[in-house]
């Protein structure tokens, strides 16, 4: 069955088992910053760590799991990482219903602690960046349900561990989990919630599918996984909240009405520290885990966190844009643009089709800049995209700017409390009669490529 440890075993050549003790404060995140700067993306596995209580931990840490786009695509069974958009769109829409297992067949419930014995301090939770107030769960999938329909929702949302049995939880105000939370509180009831941590990357990406409200992520996760996702009733909330049976850790509790606490500042996907906010305070009543659990951490604001969500965005944007622009062939959301840039690629678009597509993509909340190119431009090459912008855009003719569209409250350019923004669409496709691109014959390229393979290039300048 697919789980985190199966993936680590299958890709052991990409896993760096870190030697020696690793501190929970800053060290792993600092290493990930350095690796990002070098464009190197090994999975990091730290086994010699202490928990938040300061004791030697029997729970190890895995991070940088999805920093490599190529490796993440292979986890989905996609041989070419440049072909994820259409694949992701079709697999999440098709979906595969989950299967239900009992506790005896759920590794995540091998160890169960409840009440006073359920301590977050038993986990090796990291403090990532300077000025952050403490240790944060960054790969916890918060799972709630709509009290009206009973339909569940799961999403990655940060949690600041404040004590052994309390943590803040920040559901983005426009998120489906936040809607569920508000519904429970409007009834005067506590919101039941479970946070699951650690699974196969295919499951992680499937649960980041962009769906309507209310709509369960479990079918989408099964679609991406290519098999039914195994679920088990949570210990505290029973069948009202199901959790992945093959996860590593589950934290269960309640977000009571009026129970709030300061949260932040926190390093966001933008690369900047978000300010302090008021967030729900969760009372922890149960923790379940595997006997040799692996704690999964996402490096916030680095490729490790950007790659999987950007892939999910590519699938959603492909579906949105393809509906109005049949000539669309590919979509890319580059990590260099965080989640604010989207690139669209076309084959023989008709009159007005590119502009229709630009406007459709601009309607997606996170996206601020959309660039359209043709098939001869490599979406995944920053050099090629800059070349297209420099040589195929007449700025007075090829740019669409729209004010007052929905944006992200995490966008650092927006004043506090403002949720709308200006967006731009750029048509970098060629007009009729455009000059021919200067090229060399393919057979000559292949011939001289053989010369390169026989030379020692280790000392050649690279910049």
Residue ranges and their predicted role:
Residues 1-281, 285-463:
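Extended, highly charged
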């Amino acid at each position: 069955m697919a789980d985190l440890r199966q993936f680590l075993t299958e890709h052991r050549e990409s896993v760096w088992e870190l030697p020696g003790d690793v501190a929970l404060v800053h060290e792993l995140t600092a290493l990930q910053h350095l690796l990002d700067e070098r464009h190197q993306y090994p999975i990091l596995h730290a086994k010699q760590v202490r928990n938040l209580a300061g004791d030697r931990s029997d729970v190890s840490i895995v991070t940088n799991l999805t920093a490599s786009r190529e490796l993440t695509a292979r986890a989905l069974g996609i041989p070419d990482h440049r072909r994820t958009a259409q694949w992701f769109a079709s697999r999440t829409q098709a979906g595969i219903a989950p299967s239900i297992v009992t506790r005896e067949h759920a590794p995540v419930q091998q160890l169960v602690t409840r009440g006073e014995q359920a301590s977050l301090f038993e986990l090796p939770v990291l403090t990532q960046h300077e000025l952050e107030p403490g240790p944060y769960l960054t790969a916890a999938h918060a799972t709630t349900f709509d009290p009206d329909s009973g339909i569940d929702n799961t999403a990655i949302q940060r949690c600041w561990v404040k004590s052994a049995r309390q943590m803040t939880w920040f559901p983005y105000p426009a998120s489906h989990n936040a809607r569920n939370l508000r519904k429970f509180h409007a009834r005067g009831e506590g919101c039941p919630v479970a946070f699951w941590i650690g699974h196969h990357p295919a499951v992680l990406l499937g649960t980041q599918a962009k769906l309507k409200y209310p709509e369960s992520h479990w079918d989408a996760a099964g679609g991406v996984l290519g098999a039914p996702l195994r679920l088990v009733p949570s210990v505290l909330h029973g069948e009202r909240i199901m959790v992945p049976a093959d996860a590593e850790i589950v934290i269960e509790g309640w977000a009571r009405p009026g129970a709030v606490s300061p949260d932040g500042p926190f390093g966001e996907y933008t690369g900047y520290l978000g300010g302090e906010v008021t967030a729900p305070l969760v009372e922890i009543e149960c923790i379940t885990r595997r006997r040799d659990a692996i704690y999964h951490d996402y490096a916030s604001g680095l490729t490790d966190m950007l790659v999987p969500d950007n892939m999910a965005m590519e699938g959603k944007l492909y579906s949105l844009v393809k509906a109005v622009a049949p000539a669309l062939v590919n979509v890319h959301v580059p990590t260099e643009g965080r989640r604010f840039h989207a690139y669209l690629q076309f084959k023989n678009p008709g009159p007005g089709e590119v502009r229709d597509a630009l406007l459709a993509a601009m309607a997606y909340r996170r996206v601020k800049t959309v660039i359209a190119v043709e098939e001869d431009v490599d979406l995944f090459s920053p050099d090629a995209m800059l070349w297209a912008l420099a040589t195929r855009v007449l700025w007075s003719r090829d740019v669409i700017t729209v004010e007052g569209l929905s944006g992200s409250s995490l966008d650092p350019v927006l004043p506090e409390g403002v949720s709308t923004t200006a967006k731009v669409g750029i048509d970098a496709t060629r007009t009729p009669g455009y000059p021919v691109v200067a090229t060399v014959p393919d057979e000559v390229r292949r011939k001289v490529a053989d010369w390169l393979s026989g030379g020692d290039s280790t000392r050649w300048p690279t910049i």
